């Protein structure tokens, strides 16, 4: 009987083991979880889960520990060393730290540099990089320091899940493990030159570098609107004929509220400008290519002398034709130079009967002289007559030149704090520019003070300039979730969406608030925005970091309400007091590009 019992128990145990083995063998491996819920909200917990899911790759962090070090080829470049310190900071946050060493060496490492690596396909653009993940090594490879800094910050964003919120705040997901799949990732930016004119990025170059839009990365542009300054004042004073002929006279000062221009058909003016750019090239202190600029002043005036008028007529009516001819002449005389000129205001349309030299770059601006531009939708939508005309311009310019640089605009320059809902337009416009072969883009945000949605916009613009095909909804929602917290973010996302949906074309960079009093800035809609913002404040649970960012959002809404006079005299007085207090908290004193509207004046 005992023998039978033992045999029975043995059979039962064998069956259980077999069943367990079969279950384990048939069990499917866990799959990555979605990073966004059905409402588009970013799910940090799923990122953390997915970070530990891979089995066969580089076990960078396991259970809050790392066996890796950071190795880099010796360099004295401060930007690379700063980026390495930022990467070290990531490991300090998630696993207590990591060793940083120079040169080659054994053991698991994140290697920053060439380290004998030969790419199968050469990198094309200056800031490009490769990230290769192996079992024991992660290589961040580039041909130059610009690519290395891009590679380090790109690795932190795209692999480690970081977000650079501002110059001093980096979001780091609180992972316990980070396992990366083996891969080779070649990263080429969409544009050779990428610049974002933004208050935060401009004041803190390290932040600009984190966003991979450092101005010194590729070719440099020589600004614009300074041709008058290229000719010595004492010479200009002796030669009135060097100035533009307007309404029957040479105008040496302001005329009709606009500044003076040169007469670009004057041969002596051309010679003086030639001398100036030759000297600039001779005396430059950088090894980088500089496109020296000869352009109109920031004025709507242009020369109407007999010679200039004839050139304008020959070009089909483009009032910048004398400037284009001037630049072409100098470019032909000096093929060793790179010259640029604006296609701006009255010169934005492609001219007829002009062929540009190979060493001339056109700097086209999404800013016309023939009416109100529209930033409520991409140019491809053709939401307004002017949008259709501008679309035709960017389709036409690549037929005349291989070198195009574009100035884009992403804020309201008359009213920095007024919500400016251009997020729907930005991706489509950037893709269009990429598809037309544009070499560089300058996205100009609120650059000399803070503006509405500025932290999101500088991030969004920078990433679009690197990859115009990114999922814009996911990018925006992830940023807002991290920036305002997962509990408050749904209300801010809804508020931003409502503002966009309520906006009627045209949306212009020089709009006054009353232009939109019947659409997105109506009193009824403003009440909806305040309600959503109040819900966000209530939802964030008293977290002061999030509350401060929500106060900034409220300040922007208050600006619109005060400007439009929404409320009784007592209510407006209360709003002005609150607005003034918030401006002081965020160190805001001026409310527009020129600084002519101060907080004190606005709140009187």
Stretches with model-predicted labels:
Residues 67, 78, 82-86, 90-92, ...:
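Feature activates predominantly on carbohydrate-active enzymes
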Residues 312-329, 357-376, 433, 463-470:
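Acidic, His- and aromatic-enriched active-site or binding-groove loops in soluble protein domains
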Residues 265-269, 279, 381-487, 494:
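Structured mid-domain segments that build the active-site/substrate or prosthetic-cofactor binding neighborhood
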Residues 437, 464-604:
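Catalytic domains of carbohydrate-active enzymes that cleave complex glycans
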Residues 340-371, 417-425, 450-458:
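Substrate-binding cleft/loops of secretory-pathway carbohydrate-active enzymes
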Residues 1-33:
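Gram-positive cell-envelope targeting signals
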Residues 24-130, 176-185:
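Acidic, contiguous N-terminal accessory segments
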Residues 259, 299-301, 365-380, 411-413:
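Conserved radical SAM core fold
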């Amino acid at each position: 009987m005992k023998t039978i019992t033992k045999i029975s128990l043995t059979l039962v145990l064998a069956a259980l083991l077999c069943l367990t083995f079969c279950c384990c063998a048939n069990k499917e491996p866990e799959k990555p979880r979605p990073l966004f819920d059905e409402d588009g909200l970013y799910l940090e917990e799923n990122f953390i889960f997915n970070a530990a899911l891979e089995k066969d790759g580089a076990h960078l962090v396991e259970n809050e520990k790392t066996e890796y070090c950071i190795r880099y080829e010796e360099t004295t470049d401060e930007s690379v060393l700063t980026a390495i310190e930022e990467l070290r900071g990531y490991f300090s946050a998630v696993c207590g730290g990591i060793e940083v060493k120079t040169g080659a060496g054994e053991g698991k490492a994140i290697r920053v540099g060439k380290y004998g690596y030969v790419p199968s396909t050469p990198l094309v653009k200056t800031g490009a990089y490769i990230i290769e993940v192996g079992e024991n090594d992660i290589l961040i490879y580039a041909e130059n320091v610009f690519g290395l800094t891009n590679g380090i910050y790109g690795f932190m964003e795209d692999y480690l899940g970081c977000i650079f919120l501002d110059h001093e705040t980096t979001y780091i997901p609180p992972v316990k493990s980070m396992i990366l799949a083996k891969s080779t990732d070649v990263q080429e930016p969409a544009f050779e030159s990428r610049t974002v004119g933004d208050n935060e990025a401009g004041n803190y170059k390290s932040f600009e570098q984190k966003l991979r839009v450092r101005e010194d990365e590729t070719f440099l542009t020589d600004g614009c609107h300074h041709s008058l300054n290229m000719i010595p004042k004492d010479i200009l004073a002796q030669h009135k004929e060097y100035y533009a002929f307007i309404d029957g006279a040479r105008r040496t000062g302001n005329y009709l509220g606009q500044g003076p221009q040169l007469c670009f058909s004057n041969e002596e003016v051309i010679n003086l400008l030639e001398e100036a750019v030759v000297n600039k090239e001779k005396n430059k202190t950088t090894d980088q290519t500089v496109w020296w600029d000869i352009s109109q002043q920031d004025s709507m005036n242009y020369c109407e002398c007999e010679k200039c008028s004839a050139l304008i007529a020959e070009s089909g009516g483009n009032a910048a034709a004398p400037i284009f001819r001037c630049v072409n002449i100098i470019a032909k005389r000096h093929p060793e130079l790179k010259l640029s000129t604006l296609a701006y205001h009255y010169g934005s349309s492609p001219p007829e009967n002009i062929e540009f030299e190979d060493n001339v770059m056109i700097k086209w601006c999404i800013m016309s002289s023939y009416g109100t531009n529209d930033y409520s939708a991409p140019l491809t939508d053709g939401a307004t007559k002017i949008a259709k005309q501008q679309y035709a311009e960017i389709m036409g310019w690549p037929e005349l030149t291989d070198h195009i640089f574009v100035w884009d605009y992403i804020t309201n320059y008359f009213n920095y704090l007024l919500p400016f809902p251009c997020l729907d337009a930005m991706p489509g416009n950037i893709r269009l520019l990429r598809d037309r072969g544009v070499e560089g883009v300058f996205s100009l945000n609120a650059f000399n003070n803070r503006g509405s949605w500025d932290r999101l916009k500088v991030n969004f613009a920078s990433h679009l300039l690197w990859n115009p095909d990114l999922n814009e909804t996911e990018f925006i929602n992830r940023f807002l979730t991290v920036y305002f917290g997962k509990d408050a973010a749904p209300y801010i996302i809804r508020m931003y969406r409502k503002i966009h949906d309520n906006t009627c074309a045209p949306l212009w960079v020089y709009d006054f608030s009353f232009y939109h009093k019947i659409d997105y800035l109506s009193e009824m809609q403003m009440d909806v925005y305040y309600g959503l913002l109040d819900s966000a404040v209530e939802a964030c649970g008293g977290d002061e970091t999030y509350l401060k960012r929500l106060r900034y959002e409220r300040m922007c809404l208050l600006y619109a309400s005060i400007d439009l006079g929404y409320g009784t005299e007592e209510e407006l007085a209360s709003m002005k007091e609150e607005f003034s207090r918030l401006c002081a908290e965020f160190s805001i004193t001026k409310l527009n590009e020129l600084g002519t509207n101060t907080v004190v004046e606005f709140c009187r």
